[in-house]
Swiss-Prot record:
<keyword id="KW-0479">Metal-binding</keyword>
<dbReference type="Pfam" id="PF00628">
    <property type="entry name" value="PHD"/>
</dbReference>
<feature type="domain" description="Tudor">
    <location>
        <begin position="29"/>
        <end position="86"/>
    </location>
</feature>
<keyword id="KW-0677">Repeat</keyword>
<keyword id="KW-0863">Zinc-finger</keyword>
<dbReference type="GO" id="GO:0008270">
    <property type="term" value="F:zinc ion binding"/>
</dbReference>
<dbReference type="InterPro" id="IPR047399">
    <property type="entry name" value="Tudor_PHF1"/>
</dbReference>
<dbReference type="GO" id="GO:0005813">
    <property type="term" value="C:centrosome"/>
</dbReference>
<dbReference type="InterPro" id="IPR013083">
    <property type="entry name" value="Znf_RING/FYVE/PHD"/>
</dbReference>
<keyword id="KW-0963">Cytoplasm</keyword>
<dbReference type="InterPro" id="IPR047010">
    <property type="entry name" value="PHF1_PHD-finger2"/>
</dbReference>
<comment type="subunit">
    <text>Associated component of the PRC2 complex. Interacts with p53/TP53. Interacts with CHMP1.</text>
</comment>
<feature type="compositionally biased region" description="Basic and acidic residues">
    <location>
        <begin position="369"/>
        <end position="386"/>
    </location>
</feature>
<dbReference type="InterPro" id="IPR019786">
    <property type="entry name" value="Zinc_finger_PHD-type_CS"/>
</dbReference>
<dbReference type="GO" id="GO:0035098">
    <property type="term" value="C:ESC/E(Z) complex"/>
</dbReference>
<keyword id="KW-0678">Repressor</keyword>
<dbReference type="GO" id="GO:0140003">
    <property type="term" value="F:histone H3K36me3 reader activity"/>
</dbReference>
Length: 559
């Protein structure tokens, strides 16, 4: 098992011992290769890393973190250490010019110098304020931000509240998408760092900006992934402390929220009701803040959740529909539950899944995304008939089995700054089952008892699994050939499936049944002519772009 990432945050940047830049004839650069820096992530926290490459054209750096992962980070999200000899150089404008009323002030923690007007909010002159020492905005946020919510008491909590009354960027100058979920500048929250709207962020009802959980000081419990059932107002809009109110949830919202949170944490689609959904809900019952539902007796919670999962077919899919255990449940589309908020005039406004108050365009995880429709197929007594492109009626009323077979969990689209595993802040029941460490491309929780290393539960989805369930590229325990099995080759689907590696070696089972062998396509014609039953077991895409199907004839089982 691969070692889990080891993440580190430094509250005092003055502890760094940065490498010196290579001597040059020009001015000393702010960032260079080999420099130790703090990089702000999509969760609002700072992580220690080393710069590997600097791209001045795009203003990004390739940063290697302590878990040996490397990602591109924007210059604005990188905090380097102060260098000797730069005590009289402003770290914002890179100027030493001093005029009356705009003097240079040094931070007590990081030793960076700021012009009074370059710092947001305006820095006090030396000797002014409550104390003789002064701490900059970067250091205050580095110390006060925490998973689950920032500090609420103490001098740094009070200093952070004062900093949060103004933003370090121009809110009106941000270029937002139609759903007001992401902006081109990747500037969010009070810290100005990157973010992902569905990964533990709150949206202000007034300015519509998104704020990290780690930077807020109003939460009593940690957020779940995709939990937007809050009415939140930021410090900038209120001119003082934040205000938050929990919205009332229905049982269908609870089931949807729990399933979405588990799917993001565990990177799989289906979850066992008795072993995963109900235990997670029960152990975190108080943290869910369910309002009127919180008084529900323990004996009724199971029946209420199960009724919501079974009665809302438009949101949930059960294992019975895909010929698995009936106690398995998953989401039809991995999007957060829809939320109904009150606008400024008091009228309720519904925000469907994947949408925000700024528009009505649905886009999963805040990115533009559209899947190409696949031709519909119909099974008739031993043959698969091609029906051509799907019509609107077929799209709405297609068979449940066909939708279930084609359903797969789409990974979040990567952004320049999306990646770390963090503690979810919620309890998971320890079991004997072990889980794979999360891929460093997503910010997911690391442990959950249902994530198996070998897919033994039958409902997990390894990264290199085809949509129909065949574990491509890994040896299997199944026989290399079967008298009732055949693969049908096709080139009608040229595109690779998400998560499929074009260079993955084929499994021994499919390789032994490729066309031209004793079990080729020609051998299946006789089965079709006799009207024997046929079942498509799996599909794979070969390096040349052709598609092969693993077909079972005669009703025999090989797994």
């Amino acid at each position: 098992m691969a070692q889990l990432p080891r993440l580190s945050r430094l509250g005092a940047p003055s502890l760094w011992d940065p490498a010196s830049p290579a001597p040059t004839s020009g001015p000393r650069p702010r960032l260079w290769e080999g420099q130790d820096v703090l990089a702000r992530w999509t969760d609002g926290l700072l992580y220690l890393g080393t710069i590997k490459k600097v791209d001045s054209a795009r203003e990004v750096c390739l940063v290697q973190f302590e878990d040996d992962s490397q990602f591109l980070v924007l210059w604005k999200d990188i905090s380097p250490a102060a260098l000797p000899g730069e005590e009289l150089l402003c770290c914002v404008c890179r100027s030493e010019t001093v005029v009356p009323g705009n003097r240079l002030v040094s931070c007590e923690k990081c030793r960076h110098a700021y012009h009074q007007d370059c710092h947001v909010p305006r820095a006090p002159a030396p000797g002014e304020g409550e104390g003789a020492s002064w701490v900059c905005r970067q250091c205050v946020f580095a110390i006060a931000t925490k998973r689950g919510g920032a500090l609420k008491k103490g001098p740094y909590a009070r200093a952070m509240l004062g900093m949060k009354l103004s933003l370090p960027y121009g809110l009106k100058g941000l270029d937002w998408d139609a759903g007001h979920l992401s902006n081109r500048q990747q500037s969010y929250c009070y810290c100005g760092g990157p973010g992902e709207w569905n990964l533990k962020m709150l949206q202000c009802r007034s300015c519509l900006q998104w704020f990290h959980e780690a930077c807020t000081q109003c939460l009593s419990k940690p957020l779940l992934y995709g939990d937007r059932f809050y009415e939140f107002e930021c410090c900038v809009c209120r001119g003082g402390p934040e205000k938050v109110r929990r919205l009332q949830l229905r049982w269908v919202d609870v089931a949807h929220l729990v399933l979405y949170h588990l799917s993001v944490c565990c990177k799989k689609k289906y979850f066992d009701f008795d072993r995963e959904i109900l235990p997670f809900t029960s152990e975190n019952w108080d943290s869910l803040l369910l309002g009127e539902l919180s008084d529900t007796p323990k004996g009724e919670r199971s029946s209420q959740l199960l009724s919501a999962l079974n009665s809302h077919k438009d949101r949930f899919i059960s294992g019975r529909e895909i010929k698995k255990r009936k106690c398995l449940f998953g989401l039809h589309a991995r999007t957060p539950p829809p939320v109904e908020l009150l606008t400024g005039d008091g009228a309720p406004t519904s925000f469907p899944s994947g949408q925000g108050p700024g528009g009505g365009v649905s886009r999963p995880l805040g990115k533009r995304w559209r899947s190409e429709p696949e031709p519909l197929r119909r099974r008739q007594k031993g043959k698969v008939e091609e029906l051509g492109p799907p019509t609107a009626a077929h799209s709405r009323h297609g068979s449940r089995e066909q939708r279930a077979l084609q359903a797969s969990v789409s990974p979040p689209p990567p952004s320049p700054n999306q990646s770390y595993e963090g503690s979810s802040g919620y309890n998971f029941r320890p079991t004997d089952a072990r889980c794979l460490p999360s891929s460093p491309i997503r910010m997911f929780a690391s442990f959950h008892p249902s994530a198996s290393t070998a897919g033994t539960s039958g409902d997990s989805e390894p990264p290199d699994r085809s949509p129909l369930g065949l574990h491509i590229g890994f040896p299997t325990d199944t026989p290399k050939s079967s008298p009732h099995s055949v693969t049908a080759s096709s080139s009608s689907v040229p595109a690779l499936t998400p998560g499929f590696s074009r260079h993955s070696p084929p499994s021994p089972l499919c390789r032994s049944l490729s066309p031209g062998t004793g079990g080729g396509v020609r051998g299946g014609v006789s089965y079709l002519s006799r009207g024997d039953p046929v079942r498509v077991l799996a599909r794979r895409v070969r390096p040349d772009g052709s598609v092969q199907y693993l077909v079972e004839w005669g009703g025999g089982g090989i797994f």
